[in-house]
Amino acid sequence: MCYVYLLRSPKTKQIYTGFSEDLKRRVKEHQQLQRHKGWRLIYYEAYLSREDAVKREQMLKHYGSAKQGLLKRLEGSLKECDMLEDLE
């Protein structure tokens, strides 16, 4: 399985888009990096084909409309993240 994922910074609200064949391991690696401390997995897509996953990651990274469309679909979830972060 291959994954395309979004991480979100609770401090800056910045979104990071990535690709991995081992999602759990990759998220842990991100969180161990100083600049990604506290970042949370907010979304992922699973693909059987590595080629399809890489294409999707590139689409999200290089075509703003694709990423904006996805973020629009996640609007309610992002608001929930904000509320949870405010409680911490």
Region locations from a protein language model:
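GIY-YIG nuclease catalytic motif and its immediate N-terminal context
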Residues: M1-L48, D52-K61, S65, L71-E88
